[in-house]
């Protein structure tokens, strides 16, 4: 996954200090100090209360800085993603709620499904990519870059196992297809599922209309947005970000899946404008060394890392 280049891109973004050699050298993001932290019995996870009945569960000691979300209803709780699988997440979830927990994933990439195996009630997109993860997980050789000193601070793991790290297979309660008006009722609050392919074929976002909350998965976050995987589709991505931007006037808080757990709804409109500047050729790529496989386009609050071949295909259609 071009890991060395991506680590450099992450390091050189405005969100972190310049060019880290070891992830342990990186401080926590200063913006986190403005949020309400919830104490938990875990060194690996940092938990913040970010909305009414909403907890952000961060993994800041791996360079992915992935964020899972626990959404509390009256009758059940919804866990949106389960993280890297580097440390069991269920003990932390059990400290936050006694309600039955249902898991749904923003998409099938390994950094969002790592803890799925810990839960009995996982509902999943009915896609080939997700079904492959269910059956096989992800082998160590595909994720070993996540446990190098450049990518992780092992000091915070209970039982570090760099040689054995892999994403485990998991069981699902049922698969769901793309449909309109798909709601996840939690008791006292209904969460709408939005289908937002592009970053991956099976991407979803969640929308809590009553509270004005929008969870964007990897379709948007304030950092380098990766658009280079074999399942990335730029045409679909453009349509998906327009769907999210159309909700910006109704949304009070945006909850992305990486780096910082709270973003402003106005960023969604900026996202569409920025992407259009990229594909039109108005925005020039910044230099990323000698690697021509990907191009990086920087904006004030985020950037795009796009496989050059995909971008050329989009521009030439």
Short names for language-model regions:
Residues 1-5:
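Sec-dependent signal peptide recognition
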Residues 32-44, 48-51, 77, 84-85, 127-194, 200, ...:
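Metallo-beta-lactamase
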Residues 86-185, 222, 267, 271-284:
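Active-site HxH/HxHxD metal-binding segment of metal-dependent hydrolases
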Residues 15-37, 242-317:
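Accessory terminal helices/loops
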């Amino acid at each position: 996954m071009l890991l060395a280049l991506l680590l450099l891109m992450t390091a050189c973004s405005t969100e972190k200090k310049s060019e880290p050699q070891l992830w342990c050298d990186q401080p926590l993001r200063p913006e986190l100090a403005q949020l309400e932290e919830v104490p938990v019995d875990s060194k690996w996870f940092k938990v913040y209360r970010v909305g009414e009945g909403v907890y952000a569960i961060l993994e800041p000691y791996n360079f992915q800085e992935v964020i899972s979300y626990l959404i509390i209803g009256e009758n059940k709780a919804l866990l949106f993603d389960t993280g890297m699988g580097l440390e069991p997440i269920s003990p932390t979830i059990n400290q936050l709620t006694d309600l039955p927990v249902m898991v749904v994933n923003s998409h099938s990439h390994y950094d969002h499904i790592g803890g799925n195996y810990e839960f009995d009630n996982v509902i999943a997109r009915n896609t080939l990519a997700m079904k492959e993860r269910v059956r096989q997980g992800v082998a160590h050789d595909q994720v070993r870059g996540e446990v190098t000193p450049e990518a992780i601070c092992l000091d915070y793991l209970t039982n570090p196992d760099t040689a054995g790290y892999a994403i485990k297979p998991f069981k699902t309660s049922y698969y769901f297809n793309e449909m309109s008006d798909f709601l996840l009722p939690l008791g006292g609050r209904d969460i709408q599922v939005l289908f937002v392919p592009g970053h991956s074929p099976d991407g979803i976002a969640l929308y809590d209309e009553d509270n004005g909350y929008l969870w964007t998965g990897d379709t948007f976050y304030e950092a380098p947005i990766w658009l280079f995987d074999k399942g990335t589709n730029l045409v679909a991505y453009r349509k998906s970000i327009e769907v999210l931007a159309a909700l910006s006037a109704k949304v009070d808080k945006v909850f992305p899946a990486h780096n910082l757990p709270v973003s402003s709804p106005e960023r969604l409109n900026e996202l569409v404008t920025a992407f259009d500047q990229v594909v039109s050729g108005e925005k020039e790529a910044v230099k990323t060394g000698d690697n021509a496989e990907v191009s990086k386009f920087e904006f004030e609050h985020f950037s795009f890392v796009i496989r050059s071949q995909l971008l050329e295909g989009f521009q030439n259609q």
